[in-house]
Amino acid sequence: MMKRNILAVVIPALLAAGAANAAEIYNKDGNKLDLYGKVDGLHYFSKDKGNDGDQTYVRFGFKGETQITDQLTGYGQWEYNVQSNHAESQGTEGTKTRLGFAGLKFADYGSFDYGRNYGVLYDVEGWTDMLPEFGGDTYTYSDNFMTGRTNGVATYRNNNFFGLVDGLNFALQYQGKNQNDGRDVKKQNGDGWGISSTYDIGEGVSFGAAYASSNRTDDQKLRSNERGDKADAWTVGAKYDANNVYLAAMYAETRNMTPFGGGNFTNTCAATENCGGFASKTQNFEVTAQYQFDFGLRPEVSYLQSKGKNLNVPGVGSDQDLVKYVSVGTTYYFNKNMSTYVDYKINLLDDNDFTKATGIATDDIVGVGLVYQF
């Protein structure tokens, strides 16, 4: 019974923090440095050869802070991912820096940081991105404007509205242009800004909304189906997190922002090619329901869909589903550091002319993992 009670307290905190129990490396004279990470022994089972096989990875990072004055604190974070499913001869293939930023926190006046960080749209998207393995992929991609992890973002955050309203948080974000390092057109962005706000009204209930708008680069306008000057997105969401129950839902729309399909981003790709582009508009919906048993089991069922509008792929129609699946999974926590999970992605996309033309996968995937985290 004691173990069950401990797990009931530890696991929700683990899920909220993203790390089970960061190892404190140094804590002296107002300076603190923590190490966190995980090793995920992960395997996919699928008829799709591109998604079948070993997916093991290692992820670790540092969080540090320094007390400058009683009102001013400096902080920084760095996170790195190492793929462990490649031959040694392939070297560092798949390794990447996920996060890297530094900032200052000014007591109740908020915090400001700059670097590689999450875009403010993820403040709401993160509520539904809680599946054991899959999820968070209707419109959120790394280095896709301010939808996920991205470069060159200056972020101001304020919690509890200057200390005046408990649970009312907001963020303002600016992103500089990213196109000068030879990156793929799908990963480029012009100057942009975003705003988000979340409100925890108590009893486990929270609401949130976010908006972002960016200039598109010349390459994005010339080498894709959509040639609009701006890329925009907005999202709203809600969650309930109490009494061992977790429920969350999100709706979002994007314009000239969400990439789909393969690498041939041209406005003349034929239906027989692995073509793709930016969707003129997408409508995105995600919902997840989970329950945490005291003995460590956490079952989950979720539904995710992204519908693209005015896709301009010749011969296949202008409106198509880009993402559509049901996730059924469960995680079992042995303790705060060790867990195992299985996640079954039931792909509801049809194998049709559109998915063949764009190379979008339509097969189911089962992910099975064993995780050590600290």
Curated annotation (Swiss-Prot):
Q: What is its main location?
A: membrane
- Signal sequence span is 1-21
Could you list which ranges are Periplasmic topological domains?
A: 28, 69-70, 108-110, 159-166, 202-203, 243, 294-295, 335-336
Membrane-traversing stretches: 22-27, 29-44, 56-68, 71-83, 98-107, 111-116, 152-158, 167-178, 191-201, 204-216, 231-242, 244-255, 281-293, 296-309, 323-334, 337-346, 365-374
Q: Which GO molecular function annotations are given, in alphabetical order? A: porin activity
Q: Which BP terms does GO give this entry?
A: monoatomic ion transmembrane transport
Q: From which domain of life does this come?
A: Bacteria
In which compartments does the protein localize? Cell outer membrane
GO-annotated cellular components: cell outer membrane; pore complex
> Membrane topology for this entry?
Multi-pass membrane protein
Q: Which residues lie on this side of the membrane: Extracellular?
A: 45-55, 84-97, 117-151, 179-190, 217-230, 256-280, 310-322, 347-364
Q: Print the keywords alphabetically.
A: Cell outer membrane, Ion transport, Membrane, Porin, Signal, Transmembrane, Transmembrane beta strand, Transport
Name the family the entry cites.
Belongs to the Gram-negative porin family.
Q: Do you know which NCBIfam families this protein is assigned to? A: PRK10554.1 (NF007841)
The role this protein plays is: Forms pores that allow passive diffusion of small molecules across the outer membrane.
Q: How does it assemble?
A: Homotrimer.
Q: Which PANTHER family does the UniProt record give? A: OUTER MEMBRANE PORIN N-RELATED, PROTEIN YDDL-RELATED
Protein name per its UniProtKB record = Outer membrane protein F
